[in-house]
């Protein structure tokens, strides 16, 4: 909950509300005795308005290869979500990659979460609490002024399918008396929901936008990302352009490379043409982030074949070799389009891009919604306050 909401709900002074929100985010609870900076009556009013709720840390796995850490948090209903602490280039700064849903309904072929199906949306406080707990662990294990500098909505779930709660979480995360994270350091990554993209532009325009492409060729994209059937790329990019103009930020286009599916010179040429066309139309060039596929599922588990058939042959080995990656980038560069190769660390602990997935309590019960049996199928501190828990959200 924001300080203004707490002040209105509890009838307390805004200054007291800001200090109480700060206490809740810093401590994870409201102290039994009021500190000198907060009036006792205000603290009592906030305490009576609702309980502090939190998540249970059930697993912490630090990569042996790089400074990535994966966390598993149990929710109050028994479901579990995963988050990742990502090191940034500047020493002592980290980004928190957070989940917005338990599972996901979109069934993207290269994403482990999509194989879970969707159980439910996360509440705003559950999203914010992931960041608070990652920050607490960072203080305990790294210290020395290390801090969470940014937040990446690219964990489990499609953030814009839960836009109400994600936007509320963003407001709390950026509140100076809460997590105090600059909105410009918050990125929301989407598979392509135009209405949600437009909401970001209208309600939290300072937030950055990431778009997962999969492929820019309609037939291939629809195979890898079934959402393309409901929202074709042309429709999505129109909304992305509106966001770019409203925010002034270049959109990040994430392109997961899969051997023999979307990594040919022709694929690169199509991507370059689309990027150049977007820049010409909207006056802002997208930032291309190439992501070599990270293993999901059981070893040898195949992905959809390039022609969409059930005999998937070559797709059983979807890992792009370095020579092919270099050739792909060379085609982009020759067309005047720059790109970076994203380093997805934490693969040894299942923390790399596309690997987050946990069995949920709902999905394990009869009636729980599961993903289609194969990719490519059609897919359609807590808070302080009376109606929500007292910590972020």
UniProtKB/Swiss-Prot annotation:
Active site: 82 (proton acceptor), 353 (s-methylcysteine intermediate)
Entry cofactors: [4Fe-4S] cluster
E.C. number: 2.1.1.-
Enzymatic class: transferase
Protein name: Probable RNA methyltransferase sce3898
Major location category of this protein: cytoplasm
Region (Disordered): 357-393
Family matches, as PANTHER family: 23S RRNA METHYLTRANSFERASE (PTHR30544), RADICAL SAM CORE DOMAIN-CONTAINING PROTEIN (PTHR30544:SF5)
Record keywords, A-Z: 4Fe-4S, Cytoplasm, Disulfide bond, Iron, Iron-sulfur, Metal-binding, Methyltransferase, S-adenosyl-L-methionine, Transferase
Residues binding S-adenosyl-L-methionine, per UniProt: 157-158, 212-214, 294
Any one of the GO BP annotations: rRNA base methylation
Subcellular location: Cytoplasm
Cross-referenced Pfam families: Radical_SAM (PF04055)
Organism encoding this protein: Sorangium cellulosum (strain So ce56) (Polyangium cellulosum (strain So ce56))
Molecular function per GO: 4 iron, 4 sulfur cluster binding; metal ion binding; RNA methyltransferase activity
